[in-house]
């Protein structure tokens, strides 16, 4: 019996640890401030008793997380504490400059792993190993970590990227309720026990934003579908569909209210996990539509009806066992829900097919009642296992990112906790074997490897003893003889053997192992393995059959004939698929047993863990009843002893968890030499201050040692800067030791170096920014000058093109004007032909004229319209020349020029006639002139030529014509 700290339920064996209760009472009376210790390394002295007292004090004060060096101890509160996991608290830990200085929390571990990924310190990939007994809170811890990363690792800038990140986050979080519904069950110790192991990779891109995730599962306990221990339940999903289905769905799935199913024990228990709507909504977010969901639930209902098929023993061995009368309805319903023919389903369960002889003759043998039950259970386990694997693949396809879109990952390992039940079989052996491997990983990585490395590197270190579980692992998986090898050998030999014979073989072959125990008082064949968490008795009955996990090929062929769309996808027909029966005389492939497959997958997992930086969270269960505010010291003490927590605290308090090689240390922190330049420029320095020397492979150690010393000389400067900023913890850093090949330091020293590096990088960034701004300014000026030059050239080119177009247009206009002027001259000549002949015939010929003068005069006469124009022009030829042209155009008789005088007053009045003015009244007979604009009196400005004058007059040519005419007359 267990002794309870608060005085309730005292046990008969409590005297063995009576001193613990006395120490506890003394603690409760005097050491009331012990609960304020956030790190167990500060407990003095570090013993199991003092650690236990500190944990209990913090548990009673509702403080459930405590640091133990590199490990976080998490106590299960067994009550909801919503304020402890709010998004605001997540952001507070994420935004804190030093989250390790806040209260211990699972978010501290999450933020530390996230910052390690951002720092790119090798190994960059991180892993968090959550371990503990069943019911200690491992699944809840993993769920909180996933929510934390979903909040802090998805902060893109653009709205579109934010929506994508939000969708990825929602899908990752929705994978939890689906996998818990199909993979978790209620056990004796835990209402939500994981019946499978899972390793979740949260994938991060180069900007450390979560782009996806991948889930890998290990060893689903599929036997729970058909076999549940006393006071335990089946998987949650079966209870969800029975309690949460609607009336129409109940009719469709043949699940009437209050129906009893053999594979659904304890249905009256109401658990928080029996929420059907949460599962359906999560499946919908993962891309599983409603018709597919209904198909899945229909198949699960078919499995429940399949479990109600009970057979009656046959009196004749040659006749198959017939189902009982009340099971015939279940046969019809199961066949209908699974899409199988009723008679074929019953026949495959009742009759076994045997192939024998060289010709592979087929024999049909009726099965006994026990074998019929086994084949029925095998059919159900096969369907459920395939369905679970299909769900995992759907989840991965929904949340997994492309390979080229992520570079690093953070792994979350959540496996079944250590189990010890009254009846333990192969499932418990594999589960405890996995816990032994994880414990060995912790021991090898932290307890043993660190101390051995201290000795190799030449550090002064006193070796601390610890509990090594290597003998237990040698017993389970050792070579050449171990428990697993003996069980696999029985499967390969395929010979009939009883449970007692297997027990004898194990006890005889492994008698020398200190971890193998005997229980001679037990009536059932069994053996005892002393695990790190305590001894466990395993029954050998059914051990070999479970390890074989035989699947009759006729059952697979039966499911390939199903008309159900889901089962058709789970069991596709492959004509190239090889049958399990091989012709005699040919070598058979080695039998792949359950233990072999589980061991191979576990080795792959450990390889991934070894390639990452591990972080450990130890979940502790305060009591086995799941009651809040109840702290059972015996149970907690056994868990502390099993996980080696005290040894971990000792090593963490005196050790150096940070180890960096000399080369990596110099590469990362060589910038700190800028804070103390005299170390690299003094007379004793081997290198000038111009920079680091080139490394030579032959003298690397001699090259790195002075550089490391230069970096260490900057520590006083960093300490002084930390003191100025008011950080007393960093002002007094823990010591640092330089080994032969590595530098060892504590977390506080690493934080101090990182702060100094950040300062130097900030200075370098400012220098680079200033240089970049100058360079950018010069580039902008150069580009501006180039732009101005290009613009000037373009403008010049455009101007030339414009002038060329104007010249071309002027040429076209000039030619058109010349053509038009010629037409007008011809038109005027035709109009005055008659007048010209008349004047020339009546004129006296007393004046002798030369031919040249006659031609010039004729030319002037033909231009008489110009006389009309010039008489009223404001600019042009002189007044005398103008009158001369007018006289020539009027064709007056050749005589004395003085006898014919042109009236200037009339000229000034704007009236010009080609005849002498009459002395009396006269009548004007006007007709429309063929000349355009002849009826408009021009009124030009003194300095412009407009209208008809602009078209007809060309100043230089008129002057030339009148000058020529005057010369001819002279």
From Swiss-Prot:
Residue intervals of the IQ domain: 759-779, 783-812
PROSITE patterns to which the protein is assigned, alphabetical: IQ (PS50096), MYOSIN_MOTOR (PS51456)
GO cellular component, one term: mitochondrial outer membrane
Name of the featured protein: Unconventional myosin-XIX
Function field: Actin-based motor molecule with ATPase activity that localizes to the mitochondrion outer membrane. Motor protein that moves towards the plus-end of actin filaments. Required for mitochondrial inheritance during mitosis. May be involved in mitochondrial transport or positioning.
Expression (tissue specificity): Widely expressed in multiple tissues and cell lines.
GO molecular function: actin binding; actin filament binding; ATP binding; ATP hydrolysis activity; microfilament motor activity; myosin light chain binding; plus-end directed microfilament motor activity
UniProt cross-references to InterPro entries, sorted A to Z: Kinesin_motor_dom_sf (IPR036961), Myosin_head_motor_dom-like (IPR001609), MYSc_Myo19 (IPR036035), P-loop_NTPase (IPR027417)
Region (Actin-binding): 602-624
Matching Pfam families: Myosin_head
Region MyMOMA region, residue ranges: 824-970
UniProt main location, coarse: mitochondrion
An individual GO BP term: mitochondrion migration along actin filament
Organism from which the protein derives: Homo sapiens (Human)
């Amino acid at each position: 019996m267990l002794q309870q700290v608060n005085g309730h339920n005292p046990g008969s064996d409590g005297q063995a640890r009576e001193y613990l209760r006395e120490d506890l009472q003394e603690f409760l009376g005097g050491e009331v401030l012990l609960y304020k210790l956030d790190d167990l390394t500060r407990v003095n002295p570090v013993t199991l008793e003092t650690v236990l007292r500190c944990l209990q004090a913090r548990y009673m004060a509702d403080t459930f997380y405590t640091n133990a060096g590199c490990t976080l101890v998490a106590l299960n509160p067994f009550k909801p504490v919503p304020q402890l996991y709010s998004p605001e608290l997540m952001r507070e830990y994420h935004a804190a400059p030093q989250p390790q200085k806040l209260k211990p929390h699972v978010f501290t571990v999450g933020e530390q792993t996230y910052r390690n990924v951002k720092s790119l310190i090798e190994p960059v990939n991180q892993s968090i190993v959550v371990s503990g007994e069943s019911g200690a809170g491992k699944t809840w811890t993993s769920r909180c970590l996933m929510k934390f990363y979903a909040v802090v690792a998805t902060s893109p800038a653009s709205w579109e990227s934010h929506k994508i990140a939000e969708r990825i986050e929602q899908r990752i979080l929705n994978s939890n309720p689906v996998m818990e519904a199909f993979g978790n069950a209620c056990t004796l110790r835990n209402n939500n026990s994981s019946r499978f192991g899972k390793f979740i990779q949260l994938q991060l891109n180069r900007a450390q934003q979560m782009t996806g995730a991948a889930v890998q599962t290990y060893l689903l306990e599929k036997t729970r579908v058909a076999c549940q221990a006393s006071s335990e339940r089946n998987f949650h999903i079966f209870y969800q569909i029975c309690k949460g289905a609607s009336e129409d769905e109940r009719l469709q799935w043949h699940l009437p209210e209050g129906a009893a199913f053999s594979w659904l024990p304890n249905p009256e228990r109401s658990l928080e996990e029996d929420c059907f709507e949460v599962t359906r909504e999560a499946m919908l977010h993962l891309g599983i539509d409603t018709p597919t969901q209904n198909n899945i639930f229909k198949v699960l209902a078919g499995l429940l009806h399949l479990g109600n098929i009970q057979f009656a023993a046959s009196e004749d061995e040659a006749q198959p066992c017939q189902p009982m009368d009340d099971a015939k309805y279940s046969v019809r319903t199961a066949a209908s829900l699974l899409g199988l023919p009723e008679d074929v389903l019953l026949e495959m369960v009742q009759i076994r097919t045997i192939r024998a002889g060289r010709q592979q003759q087929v024999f049909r043998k009726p099965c006994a009642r026990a074998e019929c039950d086994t084949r029925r259970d095998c059919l159900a386990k096969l369907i459920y296992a395939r369905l679970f694997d299909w769900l995992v693949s759907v989840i991965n396809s929904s949340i997994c990112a492309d390979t080229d879109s992520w570079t690093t990952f953070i792994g979350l390992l959540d496996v079944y906790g250590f189990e010890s039940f009254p009846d333990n079989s192969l499932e418990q052996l594999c589960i405890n074997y996995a816990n032994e491997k994880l414990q060995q990983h912790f021991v090898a990585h932290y307890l043993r490897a660190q101390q051995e490395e201290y000795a190799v590197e030449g550090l002064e270190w006193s070796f601390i003893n610890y509990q090594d579980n290597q003998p237990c692992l040698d017993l389970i998986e050792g070579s050449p003889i171990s428990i697993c090898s003996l069980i696999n050998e029985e499967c390969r030999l395929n010979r009939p053997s009883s449970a007692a014979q297997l027990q004898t073989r194990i006890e005889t072959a492994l008698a020398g192992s200190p971890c193998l125990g005997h229980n001679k008082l037990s009536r059932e064949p069994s053996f005892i393995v002393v695990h790190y968490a305590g001894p466990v008795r395993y029954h050998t009955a059914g051990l070999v059959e479970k390890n074989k996990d035989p699947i009759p090929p006729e059952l697979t062929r039966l499911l390939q004939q199903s008309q159900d769309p889901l089962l058709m996808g789970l069991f596709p027909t492959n004509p190239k698929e090889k049958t399990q029966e091989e012709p005699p005389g040919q070598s058979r492939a080695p039998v792949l047993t359950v233990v072999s497959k589980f061991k191979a997958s576990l080795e792959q997992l450990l390889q991934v863990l070894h390639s990452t930086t591990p972080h450990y969270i130890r979940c502790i269960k305060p009591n086995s009843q799941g009651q809040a505010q109840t702290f059972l010291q015996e149970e907690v003490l056994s868990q502390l002893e099993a996980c080696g927590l005290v040894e971990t605290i000792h090593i963490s308090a005196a050790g150096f968890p940070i180890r960096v090689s000399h080369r990596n240390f110099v590469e990362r922190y060589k910038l700190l030499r800028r804070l103390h330049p005299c170390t690299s420029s003094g007379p004793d320095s081997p290198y000038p201050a111009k920079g680091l020397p080139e490394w030579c492979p032959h003298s690397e150690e001699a090259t790195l040692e002075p550089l490391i010393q230069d970096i260490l000389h900057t520590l006083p400067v960093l300490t002084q800067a930390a003191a100025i900023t008011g950080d007393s913890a960093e002002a007094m850093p823990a010591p640092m030791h330089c080994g032969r090949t590595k530098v060892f330091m504590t977390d506080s020293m690493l934080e101090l170096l990182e702060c100094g590096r950040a300062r130097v990088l900030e200075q370098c960034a400012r220098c680079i920014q200033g240089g970049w701004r100058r360079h950018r300014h010069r580039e902008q000026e150069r580009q501006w000058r180039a732009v101005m030059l290009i613009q000037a050239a373009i403008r010049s080119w455009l101007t030339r093109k414009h002038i060329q177009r104007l010249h071309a247009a002027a040429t076209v206009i000039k030619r058109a004007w010349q053509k038009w002027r010629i037409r007008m001259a011809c038109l005027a000549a035709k109009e005055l032909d008659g007048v010209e002949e008349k004047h020339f015939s009546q004129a006296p010929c007393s004046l002798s004229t030369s031919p040249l003068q006659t031609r010039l005069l004729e030319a002037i006469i033909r231009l008489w319209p110009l006389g009309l124009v010039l008489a009223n022009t404001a600019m042009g030829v002189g007044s005398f020349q103008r009158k001369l042209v007018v006289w020539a155009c009027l064709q007056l008789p050749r005589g004395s020029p003085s006898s014919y005088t042109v009236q200037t007053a009339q000229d000034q009045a704007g009236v010009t006639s080609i005849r002498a003015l009459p002395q009396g009244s006269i009548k004007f007979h006007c007709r429309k002139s063929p000349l355009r604009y002849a009826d408009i009196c021009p009124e030009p400005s003194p300095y412009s030529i407009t209208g008809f004058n602009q078209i007809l007059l060309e100043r230089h040519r008129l002057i030339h014509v009148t000058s020529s005419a005057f010369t001819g007359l002279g």
